[in-house]
């Protein structure tokens, strides 16, 4: 997808394909109204007020055949998402009707939109910056209300405003330094310039580092925690998974080795999306299929952000239990003593501190797991502060880290007594890096790659 401005008219189905109450076919571009007028039977579209919904029919003019009864939305530039004329045809949901209407639109002069092209046009026409464009996709993919809150704030421009204000402050600083260097009016101009550069650099660095402190929380809320449920066979792992999901997803039996693969499901734990991985019981086995499951379990353990180790409190610790305790000791781990509804036989004094006794069968202490997750990953400080700006995107985090490195280079140069005019290079580099976040200084290849990840019709 080229990032150069194109002014042809594009169209796509904007709702998920499949059966549903409503389907939406979107048209955007200079000929949107003209194309819609050819296939719409109802009020004269050229006389219709912008931002209104209008009842009518979509008709194939070549056959004089009605395709569907619709509500047609007219939105005229520049007050639209793309800042172009936009038509949205609200049809009855279904693959056949929406596709038939789309093909009719394409035959009358529109081009099939590429993935993310509507949002790309919003970016190219100055309606949104890159952070806001990425927030659109984050909002679509949000799995919890907390992730949605972060995406909405970013879409509203919170990160854009912070970055743009910082870039402007950097420009102001560079301009002042340049004036001091080119037009020295005081004997101590060099000292004044060095002091200004040091103060501003430290200010910018502190701002960027504060932003980075939100990254861990923001990334978790955006992408979720990969959570491995581990334990020897038949200790209640699958029952725990089903309990957390509030539905039967894993087979639960008394037969060892029932879970032969890795089962993955998302669950919302107090606003945090957990990707729960129910692993096959880790044990020595000659069963080839089960052995593959065990190897996948070990891999899931290595890659997990959080480990839930399930032990059977009604039995003494086994060699397998001890092996799993050792294997997971460096992980963010919560040890769960299941089957507390039975007489306890496990050696509690040999276990790590802060284990949680639970009974999956009787749904006892499951809420304690949620509280412990909050303690481990959020320092019990709550999930999202209402007015805070969060970093949650890996691209943004990487660029902010690079900006901090550039600012550190300026500070180190000042400590070594390097001339301020040489240090302007690193300060300018910081300004450029921050511009990559908003798209003001992003390479064409990056922009093309970002929008290609969007769904068709968005």
Curated annotation (Swiss-Prot):
Domain TrmE-type G: 224-378
Residues where Mg(2+) binds: 238, 259
Cofactors that this protein relies on: K(+)
A Pfam family per the record: MnmE_helical
Coiled-coil boundaries: none
Enzyme class, UniProt record, top EC level: hydrolase
Alphabetical list of PROSITE patterns matching this protein: G_TRME
Binding residue positions for (6S)-5-formyl-5,6,7,8-tetrahydrofolate: 26, 88, 127, 458
GO cellular component terms, A-Z: cytosol
InterPro entries on file: G_TrmE (IPR031168), GTP-bd (IPR006073), GTP-bd_TrmE_N (IPR018948), GTPase_MnmE (IPR004520), MnmE_dom2 (IPR027368), MnmE_helical (IPR025867), P-loop_NTPase (IPR027417), Small_GTP-bd (IPR005225)
Function noted in UniProt: Exhibits a very high intrinsic GTPase hydrolysis rate. Involved in the addition of a carboxymethylaminomethyl (cmnm) group at the wobble position (U34) of certain tRNAs, forming tRNA-cmnm(5)s(2)U34.
Xref: HAMAP family: GTPase_MnmE (MF_00379)
Name of the protein in question: tRNA modification GTPase MnmE
UniProt source species: Streptococcus agalactiae serotype V (strain ATCC BAA-611 / 2603 V/R)
Gene of this entry: mnmE
